[in-house]
Regions:
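Generic start-of-chain signal for non-secretory N-termini
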Residues: 1-28, 971
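Residue patterns forming the tRNA-binding/recognition surfaces of aminoacyl-tRNA synthetases
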Residues: 4, 13, 17-21, 89-207, ...
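N-terminal catalytic cores of NTP/NDP-binding nucleotidyl/phosphoryl-transfer enzymes
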Residues: 27-88, 141, 210-213, 217, ...
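Extended active-site and interfacial segments that coordinate phosphate-rich ligands
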Residues: 51-59, 208-242, 267-274, 284-292, ...
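Feature 926 captures the class I aminoacyl-tRNA synthetase adenylation module centered on the KMSKS loop
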Residues: 196, 431-493, 497, 554-634, ...
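Active-site-adjacent "gating/activation" loops or surface patches in catalytic cores
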Residues: 247-253, 487-529, 732-739
Length: 971
């Protein structure tokens, strides 16, 4: 072994060897164990959340492989419709082109080209994390095999009456020109206004006041709602109001949705542009009035004609034109064609001129913003495709979506067939499914799975694998030519099929990739369904987890996975959400490889366009990382993630903690070197009677206990606990204690004890390497290669070794009790040395008093080891009643362990030093107490700063107590 641990050289070497050897592929032996990688966007790069989640999955896969399971970690990437299309459109924009300049086929071809050039970035970064995934089976959601599964699911659901096309309210991105899912919408707090507007009754005798943050949508109002029990407005229900600035009249309706105690108790109802209003409109049969075109401009402008592009057929375009004309007739001409925000300004001014603007006041808004374009999302009535998830029975008597799709997915969790970890997330899952809406699955994009539907000239729909299949399965003959729907499917539609489509469904035989390599075979690979556990974030329980359960249950009759482990979200050391604009994001590869300050600043500010934000981020980075980020290596990063992986919703990543686990790796490396340096040449056989010494039997007992704990923690997904157990055993018991306890035997004259100790050192080290391997695979493999020949092991890699089972190790409780007593005595001596500032190298006298017969027997047995390891003279007993010298003492049970102080320290100097230190700490405590006693500080400082100050007081008081006790001992 090299003298020092150098992660970079080791990591690249071993990953390439593992992958080339086929070590990541299913063995074909043992019970199946499968984990599905949540497919990252093909556009993406590895972030801290990915690295954390993939470390958890990799630990599980490596652990189960060592336990003899037939493991498959199924990986792949998602085509990420909107994100990928946006990247290529941005490239075209730099060339002063649009996708329409290229045309659909040429644009899609260009996206494929970009994918081939850049799509492997994130998978190569996953390799850097050590992901032991079967890359030979890597899939892409636009692969032909997966595309075939998508088409079959769409066609089967459509023919079962479970997919329909309808005019519904959706999240509309007016910049991208497509519907988007809730997950692609961020609610951003912004400063805005609340406008209070007076609506007069039609007879002009009375009025009501309505408050709104979007006065422009008033043009689409169809009613004003009040609570049924609100006596103030009971007499107005059923009467009509004049809609300001228009010649329309709208009714006053009563609905329980209204909170009569909020504001004026009157709510304007705009069903075409608000989700809650849409539901109210449905209940009261109010026809929505759409006032916007698809560019979020008031209807009546020159770009309205472009909106016909989203109509699927000439007949539908005609219908849309009639609907737009009807809406347009209700909009005053002066607002037509205006951008929504221009219209807002003009409408507010006109309301003020008309004397109908009662009040304007500042208001904090939660604005829905598109994740991809930064445009403000507009609720919009458009024609889209939907999966029915809410009806019990269809008109023709067939089961509706709730019965056929939703309820089986609910039952899978309620019955315990699928379990969530932590368990409370099952409530989130069931609550969402209990209140589910039909799923909008169409997107107005070019990149994605094109919807397999065609329209004739009369607007009739034909669905099939292709046009010929659609015609063959048509109930009626098409009128004229057929034209395929221009829309593509929601990315989540193909992702919902991931558990079984990646295994080869629905193909009858082997599925091959573009290189002709077999990547799946349903008949063989369905043994991996259900997978063992899904590791994912809580933010996609609705969008992905539930939909996988729905689709998998419907098409295979099986659940997709047995357990769902919901991992935490990674935040910075202060608990703040990581974001580029805050300057607190970390690139996992920068932690692994290290990065100097200037490249780090340049990298972190590269995409920040606002000068003030860029300056703020640069200042923070220079403060937080004055010397850049040191390289800690993959293993230390993985250990950090494992140690943080609790059941909490968030984890705080502190680079200092990661540096601590780099020190752990160094400690393990040096311990292995110590063991190997104390071995003779050749294989080390187990001597007869081994283990001979109590120290050996103690370390083996503790190893057994630790392995048992680790196995339980793997089962319960308490990665933080298993990391702690492995850390404490390796650092404290193996390195700090057993290596020390072994020295007397290794250096003594008892050849049998020396041989036995050498063998036990090897056995324990090799077992620890196996136990640590799922967490820190690179360093353990490198060390194991030097250890294996000494034990006569013939495997090529640590990955081929079995998990070290606790039940294979014998425990010796008696030996453990003896060594624990011995450790306590040594710890007492060392604590006194530390407290009294006595050099560890200085030999000191050791006195013992009190105790019982067992203590005397143990002292006699361990006298030489105590003197050797504690650097003391031979222990001397002070008999009862004898005078005792001034001494510092530690207590072990009833035994007193004493170090006489005479001649060891300058009592006067030590008293002075202690007095100064006590005074200094008292001052620090007063400072902290002063801050916390300041009400303004407590009220205005960040919560984490207040917590830190309180913790400082606790820590200072602990230290102060210890120092005062030392001073008392000195008299």
């Amino acid at each position: 072994m090299e003298k020092s641990f150098e992660p970079a050289q080791i990591e690249s070497k071993w990953y390439e060897r593992w992958e080339a050897s086929g070590a990541f592929q299913p063995s074909g032996k043992g019970a199946p164990y499968c984990i599905l990688l949540p497919p990252p966007n093909v556009t993406g790069t590895l972030h801290m959340g990915h690295a954390f989640q993939q470390t958890v999955m990799d630990m599980l896969v490596r652990y189960q492989r060592m336990r003899g399971m037939n493991t498959l970690w199924q990986v792949g990437t998602d085509h990420a419709g909107i994100a990928t299309q946006k990247i290529v459109e941005n490239q075209l924009a730099a060339e002063d082109k649009t996708r329409h300049d290229l045309g659909r086929d040429a644009f899609v071809e260009r996206v494929w080209k970009w994918k081939e050039e850049s799509g492997s970035t994130i998978t190569n970064q996953m390799r850097r994390i050590g992901a032991a995934a079967d890359w030979s089976r890597e899939r892409f959601t636009m692969d032909e095999g997966l595309s075939a599964a998508v088409r079959k699911v769409f066609i089967d659901w459509y023919r079962a009456g479970l997919i329909y096309r309808g005019n519904r309210l959706v999240n509309w991105d007016p910049v991208l020109g497509t519907a988007v899912s809730d997950l692609e919408v961020n609610n951003v707090e912004r400063d805005g206004h609340m406008w209070s507007i007076r609506y007069m009754t039609s007879d002009g005798a009375e009025s009501v006041v309505v408050a709104t943050t979007r006065p422009e949508t008033m043009l689409g109002d169809v009613a004003v709602a009040v609570h049924p029990e609100d006596e103030r407005y009971a007499h107005l229900v059923g009467r009509t109001l004049k809609l300001p600035l228009t010649d329309r009249e709208i009714p006053v309706i009563a609905d329980d949705y209204v909170d009569k105690d909020f504001g004026t108790g009157c709510v304007k109802i705009t069903p075409a542009h608000d989700f809650n209003d849409y539901a109210i409109g449905q209940r009261h049969s109010l026809k929505p009035i759409n006032i916007f075109n698809l560019h979020a401009r008031i209807l009546g402008g020159p770009d309205d004609a472009k909106d016909g592009a989203v109509a699927a057929s000439p007949m539908e375009a005609l219908d849309k034109g009639i609907e737009a004309a009807n809406s347009l007739n209700k909009i005053p001409e002066r607002y037509r064609g205006l951008d929504r925000y221009e219209a807002r300004k003009l409408i507010v001014a006109d309301l003020e001129d008309a004397g109908l603007l009662v009040e304007t006041k500042p208001h904090k808004l939660q604005v829905p913003v598109s994740q991809r374009s930064d445009a403000v999302i507009e609720p919009m009535l458009t024609d889209q495709w939907f999966v029915d998830l809410t009806s019990d029975v269809q008109k023709d008597g067939r089961p509706g979506g709730r019965k056929a799709i939703t309820e089986p997915a609910l039952d899978a969790v309620r019955s315990g067939e699928i379990k969530f970890v932590p368990e409370n997330w099952s409530t989130t899952y069931t609550q969402w499914l209990d209140n589910i809406q039909d799923w909008c699955i169409s997107r107005q994009l070019w990149w994605g799975h094109r919807i397999p539907a065609w329209y004739d000239e009369a607007g009739n729909i034909f669905v099939g694998e292709n046009e010929a299949d659609a015609r063959a399965n048509a109930g009626t003959a098409p009128v004229g030519a057929l034209r395929q729907d221009d829309d593509v499917l929601d990315t989540w539609f193909s992702s919902a099929l991931w558990p079984f489509s990646t295994l080869g469904w629905p193909a009858d035989g082997p599925v091959k990739n573009e290189r002709g390599e077999v990547v799946a075979n349903w008949e063989q690979d369905k043994i991996f369904l259900p997978s063992a556990v899904l590791v994912t974030g809580f933010d996609i329980i609705f969008f992905w987890v539930a939909r996988m359960v729905m689709a998998t249950k419907y098409f295979t009759g099986r659940i997709p996975f047995r357990e769902v482990y919901i991992n935490a979200i990674v935040r910075d050391a202060e608990g703040q959400k990581m974001s580029k604009s805050k300057g607190n994001t970390l690139d996992p590869l920068d932690l692994i490889d290290g990065i100097a300050l200037e490249p780090l600043v340049a990298k972190s500010t590269k995409s920040l366009l606002i000068p003030q934000v860029r300056a703020k981020v640069e200042k923070r980075i220079r403060k937080d990382y004055p010397d850049g980020i040191p390289a800690i290596g993959t293993d230390a990063l993985r250990f950090t993630f494992a140690a943080l992986a609790s059941y909490s919703r968030t984890i705080n990543f502190d680079i200092k903690r990661a540096e601590g686990y780099k020190a752990f790796c160094n400690k393990l490396w040096n311990a292995a070197r110590f063991v190997l340096m104390n071995l003779p040449e050749g294989e080390i056989a187990a001597p007869v009677g081994a283990p001979v010494t109590e120290a050996e039997r103690w370390i083996l007992t503790r190893l057994k206990q630790t392995l048992g704990d680790v196995e339980q923690h793997f089962t319960s997904y308490r990665f933080d606990h298993l990391a702690q157990a492995l850390y404490e055993f390796t650092w404290n018991e193996l390195c700090d204690w057993f290596l020390e306890l072994a020295k007397p035997a290794l250096n003594g004259e008892d050849g049998v004890a020396a041989a036995s100790t050498r063998h036990t050192l090897l056995v324990v080290l090799e077992s620890v390497l196996r136990a640590l391997h799922p967490v820190i695979p690179f360093i353990t493999e490198e060390i194991w290669q030097s250890v294996a020949p000494k034990l006569g092991l013939t495997e090529d890699s640590l990955m081929q070794r079995p998990w070290p089972r606790a039940e294979d190790i014998l425990a010796d409780d008696a030996a453990t009790a003896e060594i624990e007593w011995f450790k306590n005595v040594l710890s007492g001596v060392r604590k006194i040395r530390s407290e009294m500032n006595i050099s560890p190298a200085k030999a000191i006298p050791l006195l013992l008093a009190d105790g019982d017969a067992n203590d005397r027997a143990r002292v006699a047995k361990f006298a030489a080891q105590i003197a050797f390891l504690a650097r003391t003279d031979s222990p001397q007993w002070v008999e009862a009643g004898a005078d005792e010298p001034a001494a510092a003492a530690a207590v072990v049970g009833t035994l007193r362990v004493m170090i006489p102080l005479a001649g060891l320290i300058d009592l006067g100097a030590e008293k002075t030093r202690l007095a100064k230190e006590i005074t200094r700490i008292e001052v620090e405590i007063k400072k902290c107490e002063g801050k916390l006693g300041n009400a303004n500080f407590v009220a205005n400082a960040p919560a984490e700063v207040v917590v830190q100050e309180r913790q400082r007081i606790t820590d200072w008081n602990t230290t102060l107590t210890a120092l005062r006790e030392q001073a008392r001992k000195l008299g």
